[in-house]
Amino acid sequence: MDPLIIKLGGVLLDNPQAMERLFQALLAYRHHDRRPIVIVHGGGCLVDELMVRLQLPVVKRQGLRVTPADQIGIISGALAGTANKTLQACAIAHGLAAIGLSLADGGAVQVSPLDASLGHVGQALPGSPLLLRQLLAADFLPIVSSIGISADGMLLNVNADQAATALAATLGADLLMLSDVSGILDGKGQRIAEMTAQKAQRLIEQGIITDGMVVKVNAALEAARTLGRPVDIAGWRHAEKLPALFNGEAVGTRIHA
């Protein structure tokens, strides 16, 4: 079975109970199944809270955080430091051999500046699978932050969805976007099992897919196009469904390019 990349929504970092349910499910799953799993995370909520405390402006353009040179150290510390180690600590507390990484470790993802007007924001491309394959073969659980380093040593903040997509391409892995929603819902509140770009556009125009879900759907569609395979959107609230998700069952909404 191909490896699985689990991209965690940042809101999970604000929910200790959700983190516990996730890692309890992962531990139980690893007792019976050996599918290699890598966790990728951002942490936008955590960064926003930090910026407010430091009285620094939060500026976003098309969903990307503008990251000036005087803020990249703070943001890197929040994502590759606090967010990454919080997840790693919870995983270790549940008996998992977790190892905290960034996109730069082992050259797993190649990162370069996206746009000078955005500052230290990076675009991600697949890199070398060697380190991750060695860690997975040794039964480690890599937990990867969305901070990367360019070839000339520049720290870069990468959109977590794009980071997860690049890592999935690096490993030839499936991608699961795990968030606080169980999937995409129709106008009657029922879960939509399968979604295409055409169907998504229609539901957006009808006002059924709105706000933050539009961002999630577009990110999943872009990932599916890039990877050439379906991408799943599902929720972490129902722990009993997580093992099925880890085994590739479409418990949430399966996105087809």
Curated annotation (Swiss-Prot):
Q: Which enzyme class?
A: transferase
Q: Where does ATP bind?
A: 180-185, 208-210
**Which Pfam families does the entry mention?**
AA_kinase (PF00696)
List its EC numbers: 2.7.2.8
Biological process (GO), any one: arginine biosynthetic process via ornithine
| Recorded catalytic activity of this chain's protein | N-acetyl-L-glutamate + ATP = N-acetyl-L-glutamyl 5-phosphate + ADP
Q: Which UniProt keywords apply?
A: Amino-acid biosynthesis, Arginine biosynthesis, ATP-binding, Cytoplasm, Kinase, Nucleotide-binding, Transferase
Its localization reads: Cytoplasm
Q: Which domain of life is it from?
A: Bacteria
| Amino-acid positions noted as binding substrate in the UniProt annotation, renumbered to this chain | 43-44, 65, 157
Among SUPFAM superfamilies, the record links this protein to:
Carbamate kinase-like (SSF53633)
Where is the major localization of this protein?
A: cytoplasm
GO MF, any single term: acetylglutamate kinase activity
* Any one GO cellular component localisation term in the record: cytoplasm
Keyword Transferase in annotation: yes
Site (Transition state stabilizer): residue numbering on this chain: 7, 216
Q: Among its keywords, does the record have Kinase?
A: yes
Q: In which pathway does it act?
A: Amino-acid biosynthesis; L-arginine biosynthesis; N(2)-acetyl-L-ornithine from L-glutamate: step 2/4
Query: Which NCBIfam families does the UniProt record give?
Result: argB (TIGR00761)
Q: What does this protein do?
A: Catalyzes the ATP-dependent phosphorylation of N-acetyl-L-glutamate.
Task: Give the quaternary structure.
Answer: Homodimer.
Q: Which family does it belong to?
A: Belongs to the acetylglutamate kinase family. ArgB subfamily.
What is the name of the protein in this document? Answer: Acetylglutamate kinase
- What gene makes this protein? argB
